């Protein structure tokens, strides 16, 4: 008989993944990590209730936020939508050397009390502070798994050594390494960078050894079709979907983009056709 905690992990992962094994998750940690200026393109979205209400109505599979925001607006995440609470973060107000460290904001028990279906944490693989984040992640995984909760790793390789050796953090060899490290450190889901091509992202997926890999949405793409094409390539490469923030909340009306992403991720639709169907072009 399977251990009860493993059953719990599998059941809770299904709160995010549809039967096709894919997910579209809305990221809402930008106000802390980047600052409220991220919301200036559409200022009403600085109010978490406003934007969460919109994305839930549009059919999002899951929402990711920090513990404090979950206390403020977590009740806007309807029961049919997965809630992911991220326990580590940083601000852009830190001195540059400390930008490569994520600090812990809360504990697994806090996230569970707030109704989390999954726990998330970031590791900057290759950072001079990598050891601190590895230890944080190990403690979160150990405790959460004992209670039957899945853990998501935002596997973000970055640091001076990576810049020096590989030139950029999105080099597929670096992203692939980060995905493998995430899998081997106990992640049940991985969020990471786009590597620039379907072929290289497929290697990232393979390196993750069966752990679902989701795209980190990144900065807003002015042409929505360009972003939909990237997501389509992620799916073609074997990726399990996307975690998207700015490409949703920096749009006046985020609903068409969400619905177009759902078409690409869950229905395998051509990006241009999906964009046309939702009035994006």
UniProtKB/Swiss-Prot annotation:
Domain of life: Archaea
Similarity comment: Belongs to the DeoC/FbaB aldolase family.
Protein name: Fructose-bisphosphate aldolase class 1
Disulfide bonds: none
Activity regulation (record text): Activated by citrate.
Pfam families per record: DeoC
Main location: cytoplasm
Gene Ontology biological process terms, A to Z: glycolytic process
Catalytic residues as annotated in Swiss-Prot or TrEMBL: 191 (schiff-base intermediate with dihydroxyacetone-p)
Keyword Lyase: yes
Protein keywords: Cytoplasm, Glycolysis, Lyase, Schiff base
EC number: 4.1.2.13
Gene source species: Pyrococcus furiosus (strain ATCC 43587 / DSM 3638 / JCM 8422 / Vc1)
